[in-house]
Amino acid sequence: MTDAPIVRVAQGALQGRVANAPSGKAYYSFQGIPYAKPPLGSLRFKAPQPPEPWEDVRDATAEGNVSAQVDHMANKQYIGDENCLFLNVYTPSIEGSSLPVMVFIHGGGFSFGSGNTDMYGPAYLVEKDVVVVTVNYRLGPLGFLSLHTPAVPGNAGLKDMAQALRWLRDNVHSFGGDPANLTVFGESAGGVATSLLTASPLTRNLISKAIIQSGTALNSWAFQNDPLHNARQLARSLGCDAEDVEGILEFLSTTPVKDLVEAASQTTEEDFIQRGAITFAPVVEREFPGVEAALSESFLDVLTSGRVAQVPVMIGSTALEFTQERRAEELQEYLPGALGLARGSAEAAAAAQRLQQLYLSGEERLGRAQLLSDVLINVDTHRYVQYLLKATNQPIYYYKFDYVGELNLSKKLYPNLEEELKQALHADELSYLFRMELLQDVEPTMQDIKIRERMVRLWTNFAKVGNPTPDENHYLTVRWQPVSGEDLHCLRLASELALITSPDADRMDFWDDLYSKHFKIWNLPEQTTLPSTIEIVSYVQHSSGSIVEETTETLVQTTVQETQQLEITTPEPEVIPEPVPELPSVPEPVPVGQSVVDAPLNGVKESQVNGNHDKKPRTSNEIKMVQNSNGNPKDVIRANDPPEDDLPKNIGVNKFVNFFESLGGKK
């Protein structure tokens, strides 16, 4: 193994270095690789551009800049640079290999963090003969400012990730990787991003497998509440009084990056306290001619219609994600806004009473932490698994990380937690997958080492063959069964492995019942059959809202059995609630051939529609439909809605506790 390895990519030659894992096994490290043109000057807030070539051999022995940010892990100091679009590649072999590739998307609320080795050392994974890639992407307003204009449609950070995947498709073979066997995995905001990448038309065909850890795009905090308000608020905090988007863009485009990021961080903190929302996060983009959109319709629409990557998925969360309590005393404040339950209504009061019984009948501190964890992560993970089960015929492996050892990150960060809260918390599984500098002084027990080896094998086996337990051995003593329509199998990752069914069933049954009554969705088909070609008509809108152009796009998918048409009419309808597995109180839904989503928006501002300002709040939260004798939807109306009103493209936005204070366990 040469000490100064050189590889050639499309832009030129790269010289890396040899690194050593704790076991002594050597691997190649290539760091600070530019996967896009520096997003400086006129490229601020814009989609990434392909990287420029270089002539000499480029030094790839040190990490590149992290995104400009206020570092919440280091006394809230400003760090990083606007020129941050770099990735790192770690590989056991560069000659004649075609190894599985694992691309990690870091978390941090789309506001802080990086893919660097201080938190995400690759050694444990690389030892298992996979190529590991970590990515830096733009954060905060640099990555997620949206003005709903062609110039700044939003989601620049997501498009950074898409550009990184495109670059890897074209170049990872130079590092011994197989571009046709690429797994994307991420935690927290990285989990949200991973689920979005499986749904984005920019990336869903580049992904072979996905691992989604403690966060999905169904989470309310995954989307901005009001992008234009956020942009105006940021500009105003910096001294700009412009209300029009052109004036705001001109001002923010020339503001020094340090001032921009620090002001955004302050605005973000105020938003957390007042609204429990992430200020700069993904949005549902408006469509413009010649402008690529990472996501132009609600994630839920894409998911339930089966237009996500048809790939194996691993998904799960930790036993107790968060330890922070909701500031509000009223339990009704925990109820997701997507349910459309008006505060003070009889329905909301009844639901709050049930929350009291489920979560607060025992130790209140633990109960409130569990309630927050469910509302922020677990309920939507549970819902995502059930939606995905209908949207794909690929295996879904569900897990719950429930191990507390010396390597748990929370032990280092929050040593004074109450005893009942010392469970596996948000991000605790990461230190059993990555080597972290923060834990270098921690002496792991033999059990910790065994758990780490077990976790690494599960994750890398899945990346290799799409099955985390292809063989049983000393470490993998249980054959992990994927979720099925009959059983919600889940692997409990504790001191010992255990295959359980329907984790947290009592609590999830309550939420299933609540969603089935108040969140309306057509029943999904028993098995999704995608058409061989789907014609999608997109309308290009003038700023006034009038349609000025109509285009048709063809997407290639799988075979189709028959074509179905929906007609707007007014016969006597039948209400179809959201399907819930094995709940006797909920009537058995009738299968239909095509899924359409409607989210209740009673009392919700137009600005609270996951960034989609094209939609107005509806006067009713019901979808009504009539079925043919063959079970297919025939005629569709919505109660109290005009016939010409198109199908919804959004889901409601919840309002919850300060996400980062929850992560930190502060009171």
Which positions does each model-derived feature cover?
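Eukaryotic intrinsically disordered, low-complexity regions enriched in proline and serine/threonine
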Residues: 529-667
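Substrate-gating cap/lid region and adjacent catalytic-acid/histidine neighborhood
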Residues: 254, 258-449, 458, 465
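Mobile gating loops/cap/lid regions near enzyme active sites that modulate substrate access
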Residues: 379-382, 386-550
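Non-catalytic accessory segments of hydrolases
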Residues: 1-158, 179, 284, 322, ...
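Non-transmembrane alpha-helical segments in soluble domains
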Residues: 102, 162-165, 169, 231-235, ...
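A structural signal for well-ordered alpha-helical segments within the folded catalytic domains
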Residues: 28, 81-85, 159-162, 166, ...
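Serine-hydrolase-like catalytic core of hydrolytic proteins
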Residues: 74-245, 249, 303-326
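Short amphipathic alpha-helical interaction elements and helix-loop-helix interfaces
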Residues: 93, 131, 174, 178, ...
